[in-house]
């Protein structure tokens, strides 16, 4: 179920029950405007869904990028009227919500089981999508779905800031990568010191965060902060 609340009073504005299952997922709700209609989009175990922002009415659903996945984690990426989503053991897909016969449908642009589906999410830089799936980082043409390159690495959460990709891998390593469709260009890599005692049994899943010239890295009970201002 999705619920809209008044941010000041907490009063319920609307509720929308999902078809077949009320199970929640890990990703956040994102907002977009499709065919002139403001919509809230979320990636759930029942699929990618779009709701009318005013009424909460379910406008469309796309199941393929979630079907068969035991863990729907990715926050969908919205850009220029398109939405990318992907889930473990399902695949990655790009859809475009369009009006048809007085309603909406999610028009599939492409689907590929080899596209990024990792829990670390995806980012779009220019015309290209970057994300991990299994043990590889991939660069994908956003509109065509063509894979430009793949590089073997550890599954990572990633962020784009200041012209660079910041990768925080499951094994705790942090890498700095220059985004380019021409190939993998790593600029540096390190492992934070004094990692948690449970590092052998747990995985580092927290996203890196960049703010005010600093990058923040969290793993279990530890938090590291590094100065990344130019010239430092």
Where are these regions (language model features)?
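Blade-level signature of beta-propeller repeat domains, shared across WD40, Kelch, NHL, RCC1
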Residues: 92, 172, 180, 200-232
């Amino acid at each position: 179920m999705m619920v809209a609340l008044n941010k000041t009073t907490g009063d319920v504005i609307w509720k929308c029950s999902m078809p077949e299952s009320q199970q929640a997922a890990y990703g956040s709700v994102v907002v977009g405007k499709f065919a002139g209609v403001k919509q809230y989009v979320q990636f759930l175990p029942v699929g990618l869904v779009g709701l009318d922002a005013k009424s909460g009415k379910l406008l469309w659903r796309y199941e393929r990028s979630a079907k068969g996945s035991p863990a729907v984690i990715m926050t969908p990426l919205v850009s220029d009227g398109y939405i990318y989503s992907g889930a473990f053991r399902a695949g990655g897909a790009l859809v475009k919500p369009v009006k048809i016969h007085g309603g909406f449908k999610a028009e599939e642009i492409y689907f590929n089981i080899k596209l990024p589906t990792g829990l670390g999410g995806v980012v779009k830089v220019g015309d290209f999508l970057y994300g991990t799936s299994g043990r590889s980082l991939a660069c994908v043409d956003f509109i065509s779905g063509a894979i430009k390159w793949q590089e073997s690495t550890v599954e990572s959460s990633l962020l784009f800031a200041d012209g660079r990709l910041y990768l925080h891998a499951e094994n705790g390593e942090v890498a700095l990568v220059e985004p380019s469709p021409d190939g993998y260009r790593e600029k540096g890599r390190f492992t934070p010191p004094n990692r948690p005692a449970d590092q052998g049994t747990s995985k580092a899943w927290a996203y890196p965060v960049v703010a005010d010239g600093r990058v923040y890295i969290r793993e279990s009970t530890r938090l590291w902060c590094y100065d990344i201002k130019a010239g430092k």
